[in-house]
Amino acid sequence: MLRLHKFAALGALIGCLVAGSAAAADKPAPPDAATQEALAKDAKCTTCHDKSWPQPVLSIYQTPHGNRADPRAPTCQSCHGESTGHQADPAGVHPDVVFGGKDDKNVSSVDLRTSTCLTCHQTGLRMHWSGSVHQTQDVTCTNCHSVHTPHDPVLAKVTQPDVCFACHKTQRAQIHRISTHPILAGEMTCSDCHNPHGSTGPKLLVKNSVNETCYTCHADKRGPFLWEHSPVVDDCTNCHTPHGSNSSPLLKARVPWLCQECHSGDHAAGINSGANLPGGNATTINGVLPLGSQNPKTQLNARACLNCHVMVHGSNDPAGAKFQR
């Protein structure tokens, strides 16, 4: 029994060593630790960049980047370079790395600014950054992130959409339509569906497909179903527009017009006809009543396919081939 315990202890020790080495390999070497040297490096900058500076420079110490109790926290030079020329001549020489707006003539190149952040932020959500649509469109980290502010707006659910809408103006307009996701209410945000740092799916979606992303919340629509509706299986956006619509619930067009994009001709009733509705067209001794007749209940105008076909996402009822139950 004693030998067994020794082997178990040895196995646990080896496991810890392997796990520790793997974890270390996943992380880049941390920047300067919270030492007097690190504080001295910061002091070279904060001597001038103090509370009187127009930008909120010192507030970085209220963020994880400025937490001197964390050995991973960078110094000013970790991000802006040693900038010895700038220290010697602040007015005449700009820092080695300048994170500024596009109108700043001294701003560093997109690649230099991005690579500076990626020195530490390499894994996790950033692993698909290279080749992503934001990367290829020369979007840099500081276009979205406010590193020196205590509360980065893009990381808060309530304020994140405003950061995204600075560029995505069409989507800003769409969320003000009648039927929308609860973005304005602060109950969800852009990154619930999109990963702005890159993705294996289309449109920077957090999952590999549109449907898998939608099923994250709408699990009841996932299936599998005994009777499947092919456009639903193919892509939710065949019928829905995710950012907002004036046809509820987030439909691309009103029913029955939406349905008739596929179900036209002999496959379903026309909007001005009662053909193929239960009971068919009303008839008199002289034949079929025309449009505007005294029997409007057999016409499809102002009626919805969903009145009868209530299970359009799929049905598990043995008699649900027409999605009526």
Regions found by a protein language model. Give the residues of each.
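Short sequence/structural segments immediately N-terminal
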Residues: G20-R325
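Bacterial N-terminal signal peptides
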Residues: A8-A19
